[in-house]
A protein has these predicted regions:
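General marker for long, soluble alpha-helical cores
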Residues: 12-201
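Sec-dependent N-terminal signal peptides
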Residues: 2-11
Length: 201
């Protein structure tokens, strides 16, 4: 078993010499994850980049391995939701959306209602949650806009919601109002309208 693992490590390192930056134990564990992901048809570059990011930040080997394993699992979950034809950027955006709180069912529904690529739509969903919008509200908004909105429209929608939140609007309310108003996609001034600020008690 040990010999097989060492041989596998040599093969993967030959294909990805950057892994030599890892200490031997970490490199061996990461190599197994990378090879397994490759065998499953998942992109391995994000895994390698995650490992290199960890070592560049001085993270402990165990944390690096755990992060790589988690990413591999999340990439697998994203591919199940998005389908085998999903690109690497779509899968990475899918991972971000899943980690933000979107369910696999939401991502699969998005795939059904919007033409690929879905990278921007998934990224907007994740960004909305990061801005404080509840995950279910963000998902509902993106799904409502996805069938007809262009990528640029979705980006503008996200900016408009973030703008309203910065002015004091509750994240959920800002999202709902923007969806109902069409997010002012055609506003040529570049200054989106705002939802009313909440009254101070």
């Amino acid at each position: 078993m040990i010999v097989a693992a060492l041989l596998l490590a040599v093969q993967v390192i030959a294909q990805n010499p950057r892994l030599e930056r890892l200490d031997p134990d970490t490199r061996s564990a990461v190599t197994i994850v990378v090879d397994s992901a490759r065998g499953a048809g998942l992109p391995v570059e994000p895994l390698i980049q995650r490992a290199l990011e960890g070592t560049s930040k001085g993270a402990a080997g165990a944390r690096i391995v755990a992060a790589v394993r988690r990413l591999a699992a999340d990439l697998g979950a994203a591919r199940v939701a998005l389908g085998t034809g999903a690109s690497t950027p779509e899968l990475e955006a899918g991972v971000a959306a899943l980690r933000a709180g979107a369910t696999p069912q939401v991502i699969a529904h998005l795939r059904d209602v919007r033409r690929p690529p879905l990278t921007i739509a998934l990224s907007v969903l994740a960004d909305l949650v990061a801005s404080g919008v509840p995950a279910d509200s963000a998902a509902t908004a993106v799904l409502a806009l996805a069938p007809k909105a262009r990528d640029a429209d979705l980006v503008e929608f996200r900016r408009a919601v973030e703008h309203d939140i910065a002015l004091g609007a509750p994240p959920g309310a800002a999202t709902s109002v923007r969806v109902n108003a069409g997010a002012d996609f055609g506003n040529s001034s570049g200054s989106p309208g705002t939802v009313p600020r909440p009254r101070r008690p």
